[in-house]
Amino acid sequence: MANVVVIGAQWGDEGKGKITDLLSRSADVVVRYQGGVNAGHTIVVDDKVLKLHLIPSGILYKNTSCLIGSGTVIDPKILLKEIDMLIDNGIDISGLKISSTSHVTMPYHRILDEAMEADRGSNKIGTTGRGIGPTYADKSQRNGIRIRDLLNKERLSDVIEIPLREKNGLLEKIYGIKPLKLEDIVEEYLDYGERLSKHVVDCTRTIHAASKNKKNILFEGAQGTLLDLDHGTYPFVTSSNPISGGACIGAGVGPTLIDRVIGVAKAYTTRVGEGPFPTELQGSINDQLCDRGSEFGTTTGRRRRCGWFDGVIGKYAVSVNGLDCLAVTKLDVLDELDEIQVCIAYDLNGEEIDYFPTNSDDLKKCKPIFKKLKGWQCSTADCRKLSDLPENAMNYLRFLAELMEVPIAIVSLGANRDQTIVIEDPIHGPKRALLR
């Protein structure tokens, strides 16, 4: 038995959905522990493309329970669309469970999110406009609505009244937006609650019961390390904690329950939205990475910014998450390049540094110091074991492992499940360095 946390080791969009889907075959329970519909993951099964935002990837396995944990924020309208999409595709969703204490994204959260971002003008932070920040803000101010509140009409009317009055004041007086009606919201969200009620559970009790019964539990993070509210490139971050420590808070478990942490990183780097990005590329190589990697956001459809692999960020992710091993994704995107560069340090005001500056103003000033490696200029898409890889591809992976001082357990070479080299099963395999 092993309980494993899967986190993004960059700015999100690393391919966690595929890796979580892969590991879910060995898991009894998959728990999504933070974030909301601002995250998205794409899974390809039998040439069928499934895009999910809230429901854990493990839902595709009939005997796997999938829990949306207390640390998430849920837009019930979008969640129900996902449920309907899965049912339409013949997928059994009876294993889906939703924490009764998850907070709910309300209509005023979405409207305020968009209005506040527009009001920032040139100082925008790149929010998805899905209401995530305002939902978490209400949670922190103890003014939020939880899933359990949607199950009782009288309670829902009571808990919405005060926050709605406050939000209507903001909408009307500051942004000139028509106020929302209490009756309309209560009617709409009671309907959502009724449809979701059979999935609602006590999150902590459910997870601890699984642990007591020696079940394998997989904790699935959204976004990535550099988007963490406390440890990312603030203010260009999300409103929750995607790092491994967030799994304990968002799922309601102690750190001793976690056996292993696996980080997911692309073989290059991408970022969506605003904020510093030291290795960002311009021109033809950027376009090539974007086009070959289909670098468009699952949630927003925005074109992702692309750059070389950043080892400084990688080492920071290893440290802040306590990574045991790494899954490297989209290695195949680099197949056609004759030369590949990896950032090994930064130049900050004329000084070489090998650490990640947590001050975004300093990070903006950082210039990458690169190590050049030879490309392999042949397809890796059909490789299924390490010995199938071209020598220079192996050299590249070894260099990343040595630079980050962490073993590589999985290499992904395409969107499909079978386009993967599993060097070590992070759930059942022993802890050992296999590619380093």
Curated annotation (Swiss-Prot):
Cofactor(s) the record lists: Mg(2+)
Tell me the residue numbers annotated for binding Mg(2+): 13, 40
- The entry's GTP-binding residues are 12-18, 40-42, 304, 330-332, 412-414
The cross-references to InterPro entries, in alphabetical order and at most eight, read: Adenylosuccin_syn_GTP-bd, Adenylosuccin_syn_Lys_AS, Adenylosuccinate_synth_dom1, Adenylosuccinate_synth_dom2, Adenylosuccinate_synth_dom3, Adenylosuccinate_synthetase, P-loop_NTPase
Q: Where in the cell is it found?
A: Cytoplasm
Q: Does the keyword Transcription regulation apply?
A: no
- What does the entry list as the binding residues for IMP? 13-16, 38-41, 128, 142, 223, 238, 302
Cofactor comment text = Binds 1 Mg(2+) ion per subunit.
**Gene3D superfamilies reported in the protein's UniProt record:** Adenylosuccinate Synthetase, subunit A, domain 1, Adenylosuccinate Synthetase, subunit A, domain 2, Adenylosuccinate Synthetase, subunit A, domain 3
Keywords annotated in UniProt:
Cytoplasm, GTP-binding, Ligase, Magnesium, Metal-binding, Nucleotide-binding, Purine biosynthesis
Q: Which reaction does it catalyse?
A: IMP + L-aspartate + GTP = N(6)-(1,2-dicarboxyethyl)-AMP + GDP + phosphate + 2 H(+)
Quote the EC number.
6.3.4.4
**GO molecular function per UniProt:** adenylosuccinate synthase activity; GTP binding; magnesium ion binding
GO CC, sorted alphabetically, is: cytoplasm
**Transmembrane spans:** none
Pathway, per record: Purine metabolism; AMP biosynthesis via de novo pathway; AMP from IMP: step 1/2
Subunit info here reads: Homodimer.
What's its job? Plays an important role in the de novo pathway of purine nucleotide biosynthesis. Catalyzes the first committed step in the biosynthesis of AMP from IMP.
Q: Which NCBIfam families match?
A: PRK01117.1 (NF002223), purA (TIGR00184)
Homology family? Belongs to the adenylosuccinate synthetase family.
Name the UniProt record assigns to this protein: Adenylosuccinate synthetase
Query: What organism is listed for this UniProt entry?
Result: Prochlorococcus marinus (strain AS9601)
Lineage from the top down? Bacteria, Bacillati, Cyanobacteriota, Cyanophyceae, Synechococcales
